[in-house]
Amino acid sequence: MAVKIRLLRMGKIRNPQYRIVIADSRTKRDGRAIEFVGIYQPKHDPSVIEVKSDRVQYWLSVGAQPSEAVQRLLEKTGDWQKFKGLPAPEPLKVAPERVDRKAAYEAEAKAAAGLAEAPTKPAKKAAKAEAAPKTDEAAPKTEEQAGAGSGEQG
């Protein structure tokens, strides 16, 4: 059985994502695979290439032939040079870590709060909060007055 290492296309229209697979050379491009050994996402900047190096080395050692596209990917990751005994290529470009949007928003909010010092209550809520204690204090006074008035009558 002739075994190939090739790309299996996934993803949407105009957004290709590939899996690097080990497959029989007679199967169709997106057909059944023997093993999945990596992923390739060309639309990301820099493009994502993840390869299970030990499995690729095994399949190359037992005679699997990489397609042209997969061979170029293996050259970028250094797996092809490792198989052929050549010096390793320069390291891949790594994407900078993304800033968490929520954390950035909270940092901006804290900075804005520092400028405004203490956050104030909206006018309506503040008015309701002040009005509520006055009604509680007013209620006992009216009961005392009512009790004093009823004592005079009784």
UniProtKB/Swiss-Prot annotation:
This is Small ribosomal subunit protein bS16. The lineage of its organism: Bacteria, Bacillati, Actinomycetota, Actinomycetes, Micromonosporales. One of its GO terms (biological process) is translation. Residues 111-154 are annotated as: Disordered. It comes from Salinispora tropica (strain ATCC BAA-916 / DSM 44818 / JCM 13857 / NBRC 105044 / CNB-440). Pfam families: Ribosomal_S16. Gene3D superfamilies: 3.30.1320.10. Belongs to the bacterial ribosomal protein bS16 family. The keyword Lipid metabolism does not apply. GO terms for molecular function: structural constituent of ribosome. Residues 111-121 have a biased composition (Low complexity). Keywords: Ribonucleoprotein, Ribosomal protein. GO terms for cellular component: cytoplasm; small ribosomal subunit. The gene is rpsP. Residues 127-144 have a biased composition (Basic and acidic residues). PANTHER family: 30S RIBOSOMAL PROTEIN S16 (PTHR12919), SMALL RIBOSOMAL SUBUNIT PROTEIN BS16M (PTHR12919:SF20). SUPFAM superfamilies: Ribosomal protein S16 (SSF54565). InterPro entries: Ribosomal_bS16 (IPR000307), Ribosomal_bS16_dom_sf (IPR023803).
